[in-house]
């Protein structure tokens, strides 16, 4: 078959100074290469970017039923963006919407997500912001999969969001609507940033808080109005989230604090990661922020002075603290179904997709007619392939290996699909080295075939080579994106 080559052989070491420190793309699409100047977009441009505002592009909570929906979009030049689509009645005055958006769009700071455009065409009111590829604080704090957020990262989040609020305060943007864990996003380096969408309030519906009323500032419940001190109260609820790792109503938290049981608030997964004195200081700050009287709450400068000294590992990058890969970050939401199955090590789903795909990925390749020729000329070859496919379908991987191995020796032209199926069969029988070899052979047959890279990622992960596995996953995702004639959300 000739010399086998896998990109794992040329992977840079994590200690290699030549290895890139800053991710530059997600699935081959550009993320945050340069912050664009604020502009007014054409509706058709944003419709195209979201595949016609396809439901599959929605990344916000609540899906289509939410009053304001956020989509993932891709502009010309493969720049990923987040597009917020307001309900038709939210901003009846188009000029007011554009003026407000333009004002917010002037804000530029490393602690906030930049608003780069808007659209007010017909009944549509849309905002366009930088795309943050590493999900929300809510996801990392309440719905984590691999590891809970460590203490040092939680302190950093508290510090960076305090910086963001202080910057907005300096720029006379003192009102932030519905500050919660969904409004804190993570960029390509894993740094937390404050969404600028919260700086724009729906002008008609007056709803500044969409979360449970138990978490809203007391003055909002009394008057329906938001004041600068309301933002400090909401920051206090963020501190509670970070301390406890769960949603705790402020009134309940204050009862615990007044009872001198502050450490009972702490997330049990953080045990041994913090000094009690540091935790007590954060709890005390949360208590100050959650005072029922707005005048008793601290300002943003006080937040900074209280939180900044608690950072102990400022020299450690956020992606390291969070356990994110150092190289290109690939989000599950940006992967194809096969890529998602690979990322989750979901072998059952991976098997199902291989079955459904069949041999279609070899169409157009040099060997596309090989099976057709075999079925016409060699009945034994046809039967061997048939029995191998049946065994693979029935998850009889021992026999699928036997039949596919026999078929490999009979094929006049190598088949990437046969190697892929045998590779998966080897994986399912704990023969990872053989699985990796076959996945590499599949790559030789079709050099830019995502399936071959995903199989290598699975095998490398099983072998404990996580860095190399992540690299293969990234490559597979990039080739997945490249293979699309038009972007699918």
Curated annotation (Swiss-Prot):
UniProt keyword DNA-binding, yes or no: no
Localization per record: Cell membrane
Molecular-function GO terms, alphabetical: ATP binding; protein serine kinase activity; protein serine/threonine kinase activity
One Pfam family of this chain: Pkinase
Disulphide-bridged cysteine pairs: none
Cited Gene3D superfamilies: Phosphorylase Kinase, domain 1, Tetratricopeptide repeat domain, Transferase(Phosphotransferase) domain 1
Superkingdom, taxonomy of origin: Eukaryota
Lipidation (N-myristoyl glycine): 2
EC supergroup of this enzyme: transferase
Modification after translation, per record: Phosphorylated by BRI1 upon brassinolide (BL) treatment.
Its membrane topology: Lipid-anchor
Gene Ontology CC: plasma membrane
Keyword annotations from UniProtKB, A to Z: ATP-binding, Brassinosteroid signaling pathway, Cell membrane, Kinase, Lipoprotein, Membrane, Myristate, Nucleotide-binding, Serine/threonine-protein kinase, Transferase
Sequence positions that bind ATP: 62-70, 84
Entry's EC annotation: 2.7.11.1
Catalytic residues in the record: 178
PROSITE patterns in the record: PROTEIN_KINASE_DOM
Every Protein kinase domain range: 56-322
Function, as annotated: Probable serine/threonine kinase that acts as a positive regulator of brassinosteroid (BR) signaling downstream of the receptor kinase BRI1. Mediates signal transduction from BRI1 by functioning as substrate of BRI1.
Protein name, entry field: Serine/threonine-protein kinase BSK2
Gene encoding the protein: BSK2
């Amino acid at each position: 078959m000739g010399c086998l080559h896998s990109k794992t052989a040329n992977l840079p070491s994590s200690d290699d100074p030549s290895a890139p420190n800053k991710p530059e793309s997600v699935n081959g699409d550009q993320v945050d290469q340069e912050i664009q100047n604020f502009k007014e977009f054409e509706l058709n441009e944003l419709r195209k970017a979201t595949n016609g505002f396809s439901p599959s592009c929605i990344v916000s909570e609540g899906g289509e039923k939410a009053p304001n929906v956020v989509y993932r979009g891709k502009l010309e030049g493969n720049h990923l963006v987040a597009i917020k689509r307001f309900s038709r009645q939210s901003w009846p005055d188009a000029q007011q919407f554009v003026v407000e958006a333009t004002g917010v769009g002037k804000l530029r700071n490393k602690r906030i997500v930049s608003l780069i455009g808007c659209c007010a065409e017909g009944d549509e009111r849309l905002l366009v912001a930088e795309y943050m590829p590493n999900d929300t604080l809510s996801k990392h704090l309440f719905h984590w999969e691999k590891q809970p957020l460590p203490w040092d990262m939680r302190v950093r989040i508290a510090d960076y969001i305090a910086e963001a609020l202080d910057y907005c305060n300096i720029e006379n943007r003192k009102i932030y609507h519905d500050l919660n864990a969904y409004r804190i996003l993570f960029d390509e380096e894993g740094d937390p940033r404050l969404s600028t969408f919260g700086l724009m309030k729906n002008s008609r519906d007056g709803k500044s808080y969409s979360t449970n009323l138990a978490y809203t500032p007391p003055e909002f419940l009394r008057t329906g109005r938001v004041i600068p001190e309301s933002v400090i109260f909401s920051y206090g609820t963020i501190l509670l989230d970070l301390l406890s790792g769960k949603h705790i109503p402020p009134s309940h938290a204050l009862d615990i604090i007044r009872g001198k049981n502050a450490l009972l608030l702490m997330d049990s997964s953080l045990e041994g990661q913090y000094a009690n004195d540091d935790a007590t200081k954060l709890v005390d700050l949360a208590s100050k922020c959650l005072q029922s009287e707005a005048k008793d709450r601290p300002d943003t400068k006080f937040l900074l002075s209280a939180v900044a000294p608690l950072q102990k590992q400022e020299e450690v990058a956020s992606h390291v603290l969070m356990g994110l890969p150092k190289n290109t970050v690939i989000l599950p939401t940006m992967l194809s179904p096969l890529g998602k199955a690979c990322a989750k090590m979901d072998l059952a789903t991976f098997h199902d997709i291989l079955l459904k795909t069949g041999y279609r990925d070899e169409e157009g390749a040099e060997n596309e007619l090989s099976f057709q020729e075999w079925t016409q000329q060699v009945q034994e070859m046809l039967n061997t392939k048939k029995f191998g496919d049946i065994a693979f379908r029935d998850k009889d991987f021992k026999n699928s290996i036997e039949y596919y191995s026999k078929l490999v020796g009979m094929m006049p032209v190598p088949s990437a699909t046969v190697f892929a199926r045998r590779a998966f069969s080897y994986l399912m029988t704990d023969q990872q080295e053989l699985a990796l070899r076959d996945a590499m052979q599949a790559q030789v047959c079709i050099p830019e075939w995502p399936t071959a890279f995903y199989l290598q990622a699975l095998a490398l992960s099983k072998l404990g080579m996580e860095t190399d596995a992540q690299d293969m996953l990234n490559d597979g995702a990039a080739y997945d994106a490249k293979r699309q004639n038009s972007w699918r959300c």
